[in-house]
Amino acid sequence: MKGNSLKKYVLVPFIASLLVFVVYGLLMAQPKAGPASSAVLATADGESPGVRVEVTELKRVSGGTVNLKFVMINDSEKKVDFGYSFVDRSHDVVDFNSIGGVHLIDAAGKKKYFVVRDSEKKCVCSQGLKDLHPKGRMNLWAKFPAPPDNVEKISVVIPHFMPMDDVPIGR
């Protein structure tokens, strides 16, 4: 009788609690649907075969600025060396291994927007970049002064890639 009491009052509730805990844990561990992946606003091929960029965000943000986010994709068999390849030549020393040469062009307003610079004249953009290896991807970003509010589309120019015209500026 004592064995039945143990089963009835201790083991059964313990096993039931354990089962509930395990089932709850399994349910919580199921992958959740995350936010939809970023839409590609524009894409351009590079001078090197198999290398391209995809603009995933161009958006007005606080402080009268615009954030540009893009992905560089290397589907080739050769590495992409950043070095001075993507710099603004007027800032070579501080732009080394950055994308400081990326710019925006408002053709209608005849205005070119350069990457924002900090007090040390460094670009407010992806810096300290390493080589992009074959079959690799790299997320990059840069901050620009915002064009006037009536400018809804702009050209994105990334050195060594075809210009991407009429890229929509989000809010």
Regions found by a protein language model. Give the residues of each.
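Bacterial N-terminal signal peptides
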Residues: P13-Y24
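Low-complexity, acidic Ser/Thr/Pro/Gly-rich terminal tails and inter-domain linkers that flank the onset
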Residues: S37-V61
